[in-house]
Each structure stands twice: as structure tokens, then as C-alpha cells.
Amino acid sequence: MHNHPLRRATVLAVSWIAGQAGHATADYLVQRDCDAQKKQERTPEGRRALASHAISYGITQAATRAIAYRAAGLRVPARAQITAAVVETIAHTAIDDGRALARFADTTGKDGFHDLAGHGINGRALMDQASHTGLQIPAGSMITAALSD
């Protein structure tokens, strides 16, 4: 479809940059306060809050990337964009659920940092954001680039 040697690298770079922007927008500007407060509760209300945030996150992330591809003059197939959006939304939901991150912290001996919540530092929030920006966004960007050829 597109064989230019720099195309995949360009798609990867634009996707990654837009992914960072979409993440910040979705997590800090779009996410409703009530969802942020309830999404880790193991109740029907908590599950609805997590689902609500996941949906708004996925839509915001996908829209941000689509706008960036358009601005960069890139034609990225819908299949690549949709697959990456689904993978990132699922990953984001799993991270924001909190249980996997708590298990990771416990298994790796980082539970003290995970539970740190004083002096202006929140270890769990920092680990959450590191998971999003260090794992989830790169995964979505690499999937997009791989499927864009």
C-alpha cells in the first residue's frame, strides 16, 4: 500500500506524539471528577465510572490521533487506527482499574512507593502515569505503525 521507507517511522512518531497529547487531554481534561473518584471502587457504581472513563478516554485518544494524522498529511488505514484504539482503551482500563498495578507493586517490592501518599507525592498516581506513557501509548503507536503499511 505505502512503501516509502520512512513512512512507518513517521506514522510511529506522529502516533506517539498524538498519543501523549490525547492521553493528557483524556485523563486530565475530559475525565469526569465523579469517574476519577469512583473508578477503582469494586461496586456497580465503580464499574460504571471505570467504563465511562474508558469510553471517553478511547474516543479522545482516537480523535486526537486522527487529527494529528490529518495535520501531518498521513493516510493511516481505519483498521490500524481502530485496532490501536481498542488495544489502548483496554490497556488503559486495566491500568486504571488499579488491581494489576497493585499486584505489580507488591510483586516487585514497590508496594511502599505505590502506597506513598504524602508530602505532595502520590506513588500510585506516578506508577499509573508511567504505565500509561511507558507501556500503553507505545503499544498503541507500534500497532498503528505496523498496521499502516
Where does each model-flagged region fall?
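Short amphipathic, positively biased membrane-proximal segments
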Residues: M1-D149
